[in-house]
Amino acid sequence: MRLRKLVLTALLVAPLSCLGANNDQLRDIMYADQADRQVAPGPDQWKDISKRDAARRVKVQAELAAGRVKTSADFYNAALVMQHGDTFEEIRMAHALATIAASLDPLDRSARSLKAKSWDRLLLWQKKPQWYGTQYVRHGNGKWALDEIDESAVTDADRIELAVPTLAEAKKQVGVMNRAK
């Protein structure tokens, strides 16, 4: 329920996005989130990263509750952090925030891409196949694969519109990832 209130608050302040500057604290939180993922973390490192992720999500929720998420960049930064959530509600919030970011700035390829990625992640959390083909999984044998995809859900034109690879490009990426191993 608390997450729902935060999303509703975010939706109410979204029209005010043209009135403020980007939130530097949210930007810094997002940079820290991404810095943890720059070098492929080993299994032992994920426990510490998960703790830092949880702390960052608390900070993002505080910024949302305080009404300090106003611009497309703010919503994008918040969404990127929230998509590393541990619960369905956090992933759903990430998708809502990414959708707002993409709506506020339809020309922002990163926001449109995150909208597709967060949707795929949300579907997978519900044990449903992803639509856009943005989520990869590493099997016990160390090989990468695309997580299950409903290939009939969207077209490659839809994927291009949301700035994600076509299905053929996503499948090709699996080979690249496995060769880089």
Where on the chain are the PLM-derived regions?
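Bacterial N-terminal signal peptides that target proteins for export
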Residues: M1-V7
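Alpha-helical solenoid scaffolds that mediate protein-protein interactions
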Residues: V60-E63, G67, A101, D108
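Cleavable N-terminal signal peptides
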Residues: V7-L8, C18-L19
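Helix-turn-helix repeat elements of alpha-solenoid scaffolds
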Residues: K47-K59, F88-I91
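N-terminal signal peptide c-region/cleavage motif recognized by signal peptidases
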Residues: A14-L16
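Terminal, low-structured helical/coil segments at or just beyond the last alpha-helical repeat
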Residues: T71, R112-K181
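TPR/TPR-like (Sel1-like) alpha-helical repeat modules
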Residues: R92-L107, Y136-V137
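Amphipathic alpha-helical repeat scaffolds of TPR domains
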Residues: N22-P43, K70-H84, D108-L124
